[in-house]
Amino acid sequence: CYSTITLDLRVNPIPSPAVPDPIEVCDEDNDGFTFFDIETYESDIINGELDITISYYETLTNAQNAVEPLVSPYFNIVPDSQIIFVRAENDLTGCFNIVEQELVTLPSPVLPVIIEDIILCDQDGDGVTVFDLTQRDDDILGDQTTVDFELTYHETLEDAETGDNPIINTSSYVNLSNPQTIYVRLEDLNNGCVSTGEFDLIVSLPPVIIQPTPLELCDDE
């Protein structure tokens, strides 16, 4: 004797996450390590699918088992270039797929630890004179060339960081105060990374001449 029943088989599709572009971050100290916002391309990875949860892992095994997810910002553990694994899981079916995400540190321009101040004498005592900022160009650039790097000078740190309002008359700049801090911006034209530094313009005032008191001596003769 036997009986029959109808059994419905349902095959749920797995998510189809998009492979993201590498996440590139400028490395301020050029040691190959920095913090990454690993969620940068999350919407691109989801690729318009509904009910998808994204999580990130250091190893493929962890991604497959959904253990030890990473938290953003993430500090890379492999210098210069590291692959992490992105798990895209359907909240309704539990089906998942995994794609790789590359993390890349970009080298930043190298500035001297200390940029030497420019000190000039002031002949008229008003604390103002003309400075040639370009005399620091070679010290700042070092082995870096103007073919690959752009050097600009700025009056504020904010302008140096954003690249706004560069000083135009760099070879004949008149100081605004004494001393005055000048901010340096060095940009890598290949990767867009920027380093900033500073040095002072100092006007050395002439000494104040004091009229001596007349010296009187008695003449015994």
Predicted regions and their residues:
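Extracellular low-complexity Ser/Thr/Asn/Gly-rich intrinsically disordered segments
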Residues: 1-221
